[in-house]
Amino acid sequence: MDLNTILIILGILALVALVAHGLWSNRREKSQYFENANTFGRANRQDEPISTPESYKQARNVAPAFTQPKQAVIHQEPPVQQPLNTEPEPITQETPVRAEPQSVDQIKITLPNVEPAPAESAPIYEMRPSRRNTEPQYYQQPSEPYYQQPVQQNLARQTIADIEATVDPNEGVNSSSEYLRTQLQEASQEGNQIFTQSPLSRAPLQQPIEFDQPAQQEKESDNNEDEDVSFVMLYVAAAENRQFQGTVLVQALEDLGFSLGEDNLYHRHLDLTVASPVLFSAANITQPGTFNPYTLHEFFTDGVAIFMRLPSPGNDRTNLKIMIRSAKTLAQQLGGFVLTEQQELFTDAAEEEYLAKIK
């Protein structure tokens, strides 16, 4: 026989032996499992008590623990046994008394260890006839309003202390009195006559009339400032058929040093702080010309106007160069154009003209 045939036969025998061994070991494990289960069942049956009819009845009578509510144990005295010969007492039914509403005056509050105060008797009022004359009295009312007649003295020649001493303090001096007006008019005429007759009145006045100079100077300075103030303006406009979005525009302005300030405009300060003076400002071209920080995500505009007030804090020419540089940078970042005040393209020639205006 060949060696290959011998090897094949040996392999087949080995497989048959393995299969037979596996079946035998499987059957053996099953038999052990059933034996263990039987022994475990017998042990449980031996541990359980044998139930009797009496125990079954007791189990039925006893309710589960969760169904019986726990009640508090109350110790009660045993009822008193009454003799049989005693007659039952008649049962009296109390009719409910209807509670009538009581007034506040009928409610009484008593305190312990305090004697009740004697009830105060209601006051008795007696109607006595009036001693006055019951007949009606008639008074003649003047047609004109009545005023206290002033003292027949010339009030114009009296001092303030004399007038206050003679006048009622509650009413004061009656300035509508014709008598007082007549006296004041006469006194003024006499004063004018004395002034015209006095030789001092003919002399020229040596002292000039003094006016409130600070107030007048302030008004003149304000007028001069209004006349001298001028503005330099540039426009940063979006491309045709395009607009600047609010958040993008504000971010570009803040990158250039602008900050939201007075009148809801963006201002460029001298030291980049709010406390420093404003060099130039940026306003919205679209009405009302301001920036609402709460609606920037919905905000679109055609452009902004950058303007500087002259004279400005510091060097006007240097500030104008900073403004021109800021406008060019803003237009480059947003993809727009810089325009002059006449809304023309801001070229190098226009820049030289702007700088030439500033001395």
Curated annotation (Swiss-Prot):
It is found in: Cell inner membrane. SMART domains: ZipA_C. It is a single-pass type I membrane protein. One of its GO terms (cellular component) is plasma membrane. Pfam families: ZipA_C. The chain crosses the membrane at residues 5-25. Residues 26-359 are cytoplasmic. Keywords: Cell cycle, Cell division, Cell inner membrane, Cell membrane, Membrane, Transmembrane, Transmembrane helix. Residues 78-101 are annotated as: Disordered. InterPro entries: Cell_div_ZipA, ZipA_FtsZ-bd_C, ZipA_FtsZ-bd_C_sf. Residues 1-4 are periplasmic. Gene3D superfamilies: ZipA, C-terminal FtsZ-binding domain (3.30.1400.10). One of its GO terms (biological process) is division septum assembly. Interacts with FtsZ via their C-terminal domains. Belongs to the ZipA family. Essential cell division protein that stabilizes the FtsZ protofilaments by cross-linking them and that serves as a cytoplasmic membrane anchor for the Z ring. Also required for the recruitment to the septal ring of downstream cell division proteins. This is Cell division protein ZipA. It comes from Mannheimia succiniciproducens (strain KCTC 0769BP / MBEL55E). The gene is zipA.
